[in-house]
Amino acid sequence: MAKTPVRARKRVKKQVVDGVRHIHASFNNTIVTITDRQGNALAWATAGGSGFRGSRKSTPFAAQVAAERCAEIVKEFGLKNLEVMVKGPGPGRESTIRALNAAGFRITNITDVTPIPHNGCRPPKKRRV
């Protein structure tokens, strides 16, 4: 008995004009996520996933490469305007925004959403190196 060939459905690329760029910059890594206005993730990239390991993962250049990788993926969606949300104290904060600007996106506003405790949990002890 011959099997009928199963056709794969063509995925319809949704067109998104406005998006939100979430940058989570920690001391060890930088995570870049691009979402639409509703918060649905379109693309994401990390400094570690971009081929950087160890101490090189926490550099501004690694964050820039991650931002460029994410920008390439999102170009297919027709994204033009971006709102940037930056979280964390890491070294990749500014370089990711510069990489976005160089990729040709129009940045509408930049917001710092770093969580600041109102005297919550006790912070870790200071490092003695």
Curated annotation (Swiss-Prot):
* GO MF, one annotated term: structural constituent of ribosome
As recorded in Swiss-Prot or TrEMBL, the protein's gene is named rpsK
- GO cellular component terms given for this protein: cytosolic small ribosomal subunit
Checking Gene3D superfamilies in the record gives: Ribosomal protein S11
Highest taxon listed in the record's lineage: Bacteria
Pfam families with a match to the protein in the record: Ribosomal_S11 (PF00411)
Q: What is this protein called?
A: Small ribosomal subunit protein uS11
Task: List keywords of the entry alphabetically.
Answer: Ribonucleoprotein, Ribosomal protein, RNA-binding, rRNA-binding
Q: Subunit notes for this chain?
A: Part of the 30S ribosomal subunit. Interacts with proteins S7 and S18. Binds to IF-3.
**Which BP terms does GO give this entry?**
translation
Protein source organism: Haemophilus influenzae (strain ATCC 51907 / DSM 11121 / KW20 / Rd)
Function, as annotated:
Located on the platform of the 30S subunit, it bridges several disparate RNA helices of the 16S rRNA. Forms part of the Shine-Dalgarno cleft in the 70S ribosome.
Recorded family membership:
Belongs to the universal ribosomal protein uS11 family.
